[in-house]
Amino acid sequence: AESCDPYQACVLLSAEGRRVPLCSCAGRDCPNTDSHKIQSMYFCEDVSVVYACPDTDRVAIQIINGVGNIDFKLFCRCHTYEAHRSYFSCAELIG
């Protein structure tokens, strides 16, 4: 798999709980720990350091539909997320 861009999801968990690889973390395996997980996505980076979204109108995670694949890019974090067609926003803000 090609290398992930910064804060691009490296693994997506399927509805059945299977790990679906999306890209690689500069040759390392995609982490499997909670500090790298948001919703059903895992990221190469520790996501706990990503800043909290300031409002519920903000795009928290962009969904990028490529040819035969889908990518997720993290911009800011929420306490809970709301899914839209091409992005996730915050249903509930952190703090």
Swiss-Prot record:
The keyword NADP belongs to this UniProt entry's keyword annotation: no
Keyword Flavoprotein attributed: no
Post-translational modifications: Contains 5 disulfide bonds.
Any one annotated GO CC term: extracellular region
Top-rank taxon, per record: Eukaryota
One GO molecular-function entry: toxin activity
Expression by tissue: Expressed by the venom duct.
Keyword field: Disulfide bond, Ion channel impairing toxin, Neurotoxin, Secreted, Toxin
Subcellular location: Secreted
Domain notes: The cysteine framework is VIII (C-C-C-C-C-C-C-C-C-C).
Main function: Acts as a neurotoxin by inhibiting an ion channel.
Protein name: Turripeptide OL184
Species name: Iotyrris olangoensis (Sea snail)
